[in-house]
Amino acid sequence: SDNPLILHVPNSESIKPLVTEVSTTAQALMDSFWPGPLTITLPKSDLVPDRATGGLPRVALRCPNHDGCRLLLQRAGIPIAAPSANISGRPSPTTAQDVYNDMNGRISYILDAGPCTIGVESTVVEVHDDKVIILRPGGITKAQLETVVSTVEYDTALVNAETKPKAPGMKYTHYAPDAPMTVV
């Protein structure tokens, strides 16, 4: 598949075997926004399979802001590739009931650890030296990123549908509810 996944980790220390380098800028972002809704893409090590990155040379990493999730990741002892629990192209669920409504009959179990505190995806960024490129807007804003890094830009692929996705959430439409709409 050419659609990269996010590898979830329990803390910033656990990314070391997964990447070939962590710049001071990337470390500053992790120190400021992890755990939380920030996904950082970094050059991947040989331990990360191409199917997890959509064949890209970078891996998307996130440390979720949920104690139960981080405990699960710690006990698993490996990163977990975890897309949103929804049908691709549909809005991301914020409660177990949302997951049930969207995925009913498609999955065997739902782990209900309470509702999400943020109803949007994580912000996905690519770090180059002291510059941050937003690949997918989400729970961390450009202004918040600029409190840590002086140069923050939006990726041009956000407005060009022909570009190969560089990060999770760029290939398919997000926030696409199945509802009628009237334009007045």
Where are the language model's segments positioned?
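Active-site-adjacent structural elements in enzyme catalytic cores
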Residues: S1-V184
